[in-house]
Amino acid sequence: MKTPTARTSGLFFTFALLLTACGGGANTGTNTTANTSATTNSSSAIPIGIAFAQTSNVALLGQEGVAGAKIAEKYFNDKGGINGTPIRLVFQDTGGDEAGAINAFQTLINQNRVFGIVGPTLSQQAFSANPIAERAKVPVIGASNTAKGIPQIGDYIARVSAPVSIVAPNSVKAALKINPNIKKVAVFYAQNDAFNKSETEIFQQTVKDQGLDLVTVQKFQTTDTDFQTQATNAINLKPDLVIISGLSADGGNLVRQLRELGYKGIIIGGNGLNTSSVLSVCKALCDGVLIAQAYSPDHPGEINNAFRTIYTNQYKKAPPQFSAQAFSAVQVYVEALKALDQKNKISQLPLPQLRTELNKQLLTGKYETPLGQIAFTPEGEVIQKEFYVAQIKMEQNGTNGKFAFLK
């Protein structure tokens, strides 16, 4: 178990700080700027980095995170920011691969000099980019990283996205409530993605724990579009349940092709399909897909009511999980910075010290977020109590749909 070290952040510099690059084991937390206060101008906004995918096949997920973060920025600034000082979110596109995430983190740390980072979009990216921030002693809060081992990357790594080991089994249990006669299960997963490899292990273990027969495990790539071979192989074994661990584009296409080939049973989608963007991929054939949830738009609570209202007014639909988690990650930084500033004026702290103190503060707090109340273990794992399962319900036009939450 890691010892919590302080996470500190400071106000946006009005002059350039000389920081070394974060790659190749360099430690940007120790350089000649250690005695420079975090700001020389109390009116400067507080920079928080947002590293989400805005391009590539992962953009369908990343854009939902961007939406939630932007809502949080305006919401908390309208409420006074950090004791009167506004926050300023600095966005960097991670793209869909590890190199993109590494570049985004390096830019946020070295050029933008952020106090902390929210991101990256994928767990696969986190395993490559988070060590950069860890060496630089820059706090990171994962908003959509659910694979096993994320908080264990280092002292400065936390997440508000509940681990797949807690969330995923709920959808299998829901499927068994809908059809208690399920016996045979086919599993599909994207073998080139760390999260999906982690998630499928949980799904496969859950299948065994429920006494079900795992008849086949089919592999694919997140970049694939043709699943005829894998789908046909699985359908020939007559499964009662299909479980898919993929992203929204590939996962949605797999759902569509399974239905087109005649599969009639229940389909479970993993966390990568937990976005309304999947509806435009499989359209009418998305109907009935089950997906476990770490967020419900109907969760009671003042801040979720506010978040849901703002999101719905802006996007004309209920907020998805990834937007709520991104909002919550920004909220954690805001509340931790406010608490820290009341102890020691953050504008007077050197940036390395500020990042360290911020890290320490955020790990000790409790937060009433759109996800419900959350907190963190000493090693940065989120503590969350409430989880859900939703079923996709498509309208007759085959274009519009929603996530209907099961009781």
Predicted regions and their residues:
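Extracytosolic ligand-binding ectodomains
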Residues: K2-P4, F13-L18, C22-K407
